């Protein structure tokens, strides 16, 4: 059923909600600033325009609203989570509502994500909390609340954040009530936080990767500081002073998931199954900023996916720094292959994806489960990093070139239609031309569908940063260009293997450049463009692949 009504006035979007019997109309702004919301169903879906021009589905949970109604914000905050955060959500709502009424418009929030799928999923949670507080999500950074969820895997990511912070500082001078928050992996580095304290004093809030669930509480603290500043402005005996709130945890064993989420897509979703990493590859900062491995309980994961399916999700992406090591440390151990079998049993779920896999932990059992599955997508991201056994040892990857090649062959034999993708680093300290040729040899033998190629980035605090024989920049650039050409040439050949066949495609969006086309993904993660309209979004359809363009297909609906 299509919405017959979609009215946009002064940034307020009203929709008919088809899921409610009789067609009740709601104003999005009203929904977002009210302290209590009453619906006939436990979950009501309201479409709204959010970041990057995408359409998302905002899930309002009646149960959460009932909990919020019972909370007395004049009393002490609960100690248990997530009840403690519900308290601060309601407390922040009061301020946002009052400020919105004062300005005569809803307060807006913009979230920017740098980095991996884990960060993207974290950002959905952060934006969900902000919207539940009462902020309206927008695309541009001239918002009332700007949040950067940062990445620190490579130095360039840090530099991008610093550059954009300078622009935000200029905006904040014009709009003093604006709030700026920074979180994510970059904020776990002590020297980064110190630099921000000294150079970017206008930032309001800094927190890390371990306590993103505390956003409402931290925003509440910032708002209290803001009120104190305003009070000081009217007093001669006090000079207003901006206070930056910093709350970065070194590590945690706490997992808090039962909080609002603002999903980018209504039909697919990421699901965290574990956090942290125990591998300590010598070049990687992740274990230091994400902490040690900790797995979620299987029942919580299955319950979350079932709820997502009830809300219309047909595809999930199981997320973890190394999903293959899932289950270690649980009271009742369950390995990743066994978890996949349980997820497969969920009725209504059509597709299962996962990332990332570490080659040393990829078991025969997992390959067998993937081979017989009707739901696990035919795509496996298996980071290589280097084809040289000598360099792999220096990287602390704990496998050799020969072991990787044997594993890739085993996977392709068991699952002939699998799409293998990878990560490769060029210019690791001590890498010789011979080492680089070993990498090219693996690329030619495995014939990856695609590869993310990176120039080694020295990260302070990692063992590799202190290694001698750093490779000269011009040599690294030359190798990178040669590797990229090799990867692209092979990918163009491999990715065209399904031309003139019919494949099932999950339609994701109307094409940005050609609105008469829609764009979707095959099971093996290859992009397909074909004629269609927005009514196909979120549906699995059969598409005839007419032409291969090297890295994507052009097709038509197979009717």
Each language-model region and where it sits:
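Polybasic, lysine-rich low-complexity intrinsically disordered segments
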Residues: 2-3, 9-10, 17, 32-33
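N-terminal amphipathic/hydrophobic targeting modules at extreme N-termini
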Residues: 17-24, 34-35, 41
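Basic polycationic patches enriched in arginine
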Residues: 40-43, 235
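Proteins enriched for Cys/Gly/acidic motifs involved in redox and nucleic-acid/cofactor modification
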Residues: 52-326, 365, 380, 402-409, ...
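Short glycine-enriched, charge-decorated loop/helix-capping segments at active-site entrances
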Residues: 152-153, 290-291, 330-333, 393-399, ...
